[in-house]
Curated annotation (Swiss-Prot):
Gene symbol of the encoding locus: valS
Cross-referenced InterPro entries: aa-tRNA-synth_I_CS, aa-tRNA-synth_Ia, Anticodon_Ia_Val, M/V/L/I-tRNA-synth_anticd-bd, Rossmann-like_a/b/a_fold, tRNA-bd_arm, tRNAsynth_Ia_anticodon-bd, Val-tRNA_synth_C_sf
Catalytic reaction equation(s): tRNA(Val) + L-valine + ATP = L-valyl-tRNA(Val) + AMP + diphosphate
A molecular function GO annotation: valine-tRNA ligase activity
Tagged with keyword Ligase: yes
Subunit structure: Monomer.
Stored NCBIfam families: PRK05729.1, valS
Coiled coil segments of this chain: none
Top EC class of this enzyme: ligase
Role, per record: Catalyzes the attachment of valine to tRNA(Val). As ValRS can inadvertently accommodate and process structurally similar amino acids such as threonine, to avoid such errors, it has a 'posttransfer' editing activity that hydrolyzes mischarged Thr-tRNA(Val) in a tRNA-dependent manner.
Name of protein: Valine--tRNA ligase
UniProt entry tagged with the keyword GTP-binding: no
Intervals of motif 'HIGH' region: 45-55
């Protein structure tokens, strides 16, 4: 006999151990002969990471598919692994060194520091895998990969060298997102916009001597200028005055009539003295500010593009750590005549932190009368998500991938339907990103990561090879082949050769996303031709969040299509489907963040409710394209769903339903059993199709309805007289049928609730119900049974009883009161059903007797069931007048509250200023009140008709 209650805390580790000891999730286990493969690669979590709700949703959905396909007999591989997370890991280890008062990264040197990181990884990295196991993730854990593993590193080197030699990787000087704290380039996804209360400084840039223009200062109601003033300066606005030191132009729109006469003229840059041109460009908006925009091509992405078009110089005035550098800066000093009057200002600014320099520059401009005005300005400032400080667009030389060329086959793969996005609307986002793709900056100024396989000769010549030996060989061939001073220099070095004398390796490492882009094939052994690569590539579906479609999904497609070919040489996509799941938000629909204090820890939920309850909640709420609003109360509700199944199993055991030996579904004789077998087959079909179509919420919903409503609430309830009766044949059939259906339920629910179902599968074994495999290896049920007549009959009975119960509840009939039931207009089939199920109707609907009549009795509530009308004469059971009055008062109360909420929601100030969760709560309350009013209105109509 099952324990009275299910203890998830005790069961989950026991089941996890059983799976582990059985090697239950090894690739190919449980596969049928010549089975087709089903492959998923896990989005590799950071080695520094811990499980969050996004991981929980993402991996729950993957696990549902993996367990489903494994039970269907496919050759399944769910490939696990971790990302080395360059910046995050380096920061964690550096912080640990500081906390332990050990030598810093710089003090210990590169080799010792990297060794220290590997030690940290062995001690503390990979915590998230144990957390994923607690969630029930059925990966092939024996195949765990790490992006810095030897094999994966070999793949990274091979790809870099190949792309470089094809001209698809190159060095270039461009603007990058630069983190002055970490002193490295970072990717867009590592940039977090933060709203700050700043200022907009409107600065006056003097026109060169003798140049003036007429600037409008008054306008009529149609916006036409009526007054002008002569100006010898332009007003430009900026939120970053410190960058003005690098200004090399002022842009105005070519159609802006205010400035037509001075395009091509120059302004004199304050503090610097540089003569910079006024250029006409489409970028400035004439309706914003003065319409004149200062151009700092070395410190702003938009200005960089304008500068390229207009031929403006690029002057970098910030060091790697965000300090002003001008006095020994050749780019800054070029073309300046070094007026002594400015040297004092330069001395004050040299070496100052950017924000300190901002204050000094504003002071200097105010002293010179060149600050037109200052206004408060709330705006978004990009910050590095790791360093936590404002990032700087910075002009540096970096390594780039020609993403535009690699993107073309990926775009074609989606357009031609070889890779599909689910939901499909994400394809539009994919195309927008890919068709406007920029060169991909792949170098990072870090130590932890894949060091770029590039070496520099004494003259700066680049040699990109798989290792230093190959690079040295290439360098020698290069220099010896060309007559000149370098040939003699290298020949001299070779006579007394010492490692490192001829070549110097690039110190940068690759962007973490570079190695992640190879994940679908590097984890299978590429560039070696392994059996796993041949069998499991192409993978089937990638499950991901929308935020990394560009950073990861698109890049995997670019790399996969470039490097993976079939036997005919045709490029092969890394996956045929990309399933994009939504965000997990809090119960009020707010994005979870530490600053809001609304982060929900999935491990705490597992501790409290069990992994199965969390998984089922996430699945049933995972509607395509709709964010998950996670309320712990919902998880508690779905824990109750598990309890319902547990109790149903106990009920079955107590009533002898412990074996399905000899049970043949097609031979079932009782209508109730034929009905549940039909509904079971319908559920099998619905669940299977929904999982195949990535409609996880519909699959979970179908299971919930079948298990809770049809099986527990109706089937077991309708069987009670059979279990307690004297018809032994009917009892034996029903006991066997119940055991059979329960086994099928365990199988169907297993992908969603693996721990409880595996426990039930084990605990219900016995003679005639032997378990030859773990449930996770049991065969997925087949939808083969159909008896529409039985289904129609029992569903008719359910509709009738449910209708009577609803009327009783709506009209406030006391639960113990027995009501008469009068049937009007029943045809022969309905009359036969009434006779067959009379005892069930009386017991379940609290009906005293059933009569037939030609007209509905006066004072009765009526329910239409099929062609007949079921009438409940309630005048003798309730005071119809008092009930009518009660309902009218309830409706009036609802109306008052509805009007109050409608008034608040119509108030623009409330909607604009109240906390979003409060506004959302009021909207949800309004929906509840509308539903209440509808129900009360139906009840009032029934009472009025009955009276």
């Amino acid at each position: 006999m099952l324990d009275k209650t299910y203890d998830s805390a005790a069961v989950e580790p026991k089941i996890a151990k059983a799976w582990d000891e059985a090697d239950a999730f090894r690739a190919g286990v449980n596969a049928k002969p010549d089975a087709e493969t089903f492959t998923i690669v896990i989005p590799p979590p950071n080695v520094t990471g811990s499980l969050h709700m996004g991981h929980a949703l993402n991996n729950t959905l993957q696990d549902i598919m993996v367990r489903f396909e494994r039970m269907r007999g496919k050759d399944v591989l769910w490939q696990p692994g971790m990302d080395h997370a360059g910046i995050a890991t380096q920061m964690v280890v550096e912080r640990q060194l500081m906390e332990r008062q050990l030598p810093s990264r710089r003090d210990m040197g590169r080799e010792a520091f990297i060794e220290r990181v590997w030690e940290w990884k062995a001690e503390s990295g990979g915590l998230i895998f144990n957390q994923l196991k607690r969630l029930g993730a059925s990966c092939d854990w024996s195949r765990e990969r790490f992006t810095m593993d030897e094999g994966l590193s070999e793949a990274v080197i091979e790809v870099f060298v190949s792309l470089y030699k094809e001209g698809l990787i190159y060095r270039d000087t461009r603007l990058v997102n630069w983190d002055p704290k970490l002193q490295t380039a970072i990717s867009d996804i590592e940039v977090e916009p933060v709203e700050v209360n700043g200022h907009l400084w409107h600065l006056r840039y003097p026109l060169e001597e003798g140049v003036t223009y007429q600037h409008p200062v008054a306008f009529d109601e149609d916006g036409n200028a009526t007054e002008w003033e002569t100006r010898n300066y332009l007003v430009v606005a900026t939120t970053r005055p410190e960058t003005m030191l690098g200004d090399t132009g002022v842009a105005v729109h070519p159609d802006d009539v205010r400035y037509k006469g001075i395009v091509g003229k120059h302004v004199i840059l304050p503090i610097v003295g540089r003569r910079i041109p006024i250029v006409a460009d489409e970028y400035p908006d004439p309706t914003t500010g003065t319409g004149a925009v200062k151009m700092t091509p070395a410190h702003d992405f938009n200005d960089f593009d304008v500068g390229k078009r207009q031929g403006l110089r690029q002057v970098n005035v910030l060091t790697a750590d965000g300090r002003i550098t001008i006095k020994n800066n050749e780019d800054f000093l070029e073309g300046l005549d070094h007026p002594a009057a400015l040297h004092g200002a330069w001395d004050r600014l040299e070496g100052k932190d950017r924000f300190e320099a901002r204050k000094l520059i504003v002071e200097m401009l105010e002293e010179a009368g060149l600050v037109d005005h200052i206004e408060p300005h709330k705006h978004m400032v990009p910050h590095g998500d790791r360093g936590g400080v404002p990032i700087e667009p910075r002009l540096t030389e970096q390594w780039y991938v020609d993403a535009k060329t690699l993107a073309k086959p990926a775009i074609a793969a989606v357009k031609e339907g070889r890779t599909n996005f689910v939901p499909k609307n994400w394809e539009k986002t994919f195309f927008e990103w890919m068709e406007n793709i920029q060169p991909w900056c792949i170098s990072r100024q870090l130590w932890w990561g894949h060091q770029i396989p590039a070496w520099y000769g004494p003259d700066g010549q680049i040699f990109v090879e798989r290792n230093e030996e190959e690079a040295l060989h290439a360098a020698i061939q290069h220099y010896i082949a060309h007559e000149g001073p370098m040939k003699a220099y290298v020949e001299d070095l070779l006579e007394n050769f010492k490692p490192g004398e001829i070549l110097t390796r690039d110190e940068d490492v690759l962007d973490t996303w570079f190695s992640s882009a190879l994940w679908p094939f590097s984890t299978l052994g590429w560039p070696k031709e392994t059996p796993e690569l041949d069998k499991y590539y192409q993978t089937d579906v990638l499950v991901t969040g929308f935020d990394i479609i560009f950073f990861w999904v698109a890049r995997m497609m670019m790399m996969g299509l470039h490097f993976m070919k079939d036997a005919d040489g045709t490029p092969v996509e890394p996956f045929h489907t990309v399933y994009v799941h939504a965000l997990v938000r809090d119960k009020n629909g707010q994005k979870m963040s530490k600053s809001k204090g609304n982060v929900i820890d999935p491990l705490e939920l597992i501790d409290e409710y069990g992994a199965d309850a969390l998984r089922f909640t996430l699945a049933i709420m995972a509607a395509q394209g709709r964010d998950v609003k996670l309320d712990p109360a919902r998880i508690a509700g779905y824990r109750n769903f598990g309890t319902k199944l547990w109790n149903a199993t106990r009920f079955a055991e107590m009533n002898g339903a412990i074996s399905s030996e000899g049970f043949i579904p097609e031979a079932a004789s009782l209508t109730i059993n034929r009905w549940i077998l039909t509904e079971l087959s319908r559920t099998i079909r619905d669940v299977s199709e929904a999982i195949e179509d990535y409609r996880f919420n519909e699959a979970a919903g179908a299971l919930y309805r079948f298990v809770w409503n049809q099986f527990c609430d109706w089937y077991l309830e309708l069987l009670k007289p059979v279990f307690n009766g004297d018809d032994e044949a009917a009892k034996r059939e029903s006991q066997a049928c119940t055991a059979y259906v329960l086994d099928e339920i365990y199988k169907l629910l297993h992908p969603f609730m693996p721990f409880m179902t595996e426990e039930l599968w084990e605990k219900t074994t016995g003679p005639g119900r032997e378990r030859t495999t773990l449930l996770c290896h049991a065969e997925w049920p087949a939808a083969f049974y159909a008896d529409d007549a039985a289904a129609d009959e029992i569903n008719w009975l359910i509709d009738l009883v449910s209708g009577i119960r609803s009327v009783r509840a709506e009209m406030n009939v006391p639960p113990a009161a027995m009501a008469p039931l009068v049937i009007v207009g029943a045809k022969a089939l309905t009359s036969e059903r009434l006779d067959r199920h009379a005892s069930a109707i009386k017991r379940l609907a609290r009906v005293e007797n059933i009569e037939h009549a030609s007209v509905a009795p006066r004072g009765s509530a009526q329910i239409v069931v099929g062609e007949a009308t079921a009438c409940l004469p309630l005048g003798s059971l309730i005071d119809l007048g008092a009930e009518k009055l009660r309902l009218e008062k309830a409706i009036a109360k609802v109306d008052v509250e509805r009007e109050r909420i409608l008034g608040k929601l119509a108030n623009e100030k409330f909607v604009a200023n109240a906390k979003p969760e409060l506004v959302e709560a009021e909207r949800e309350r309004l929906v509840e009140l509308d539903l209440q009013r509808d129900s009360l209105g139906v009840a009032l109509s029934r009472v009025s008709e009955a009276g």
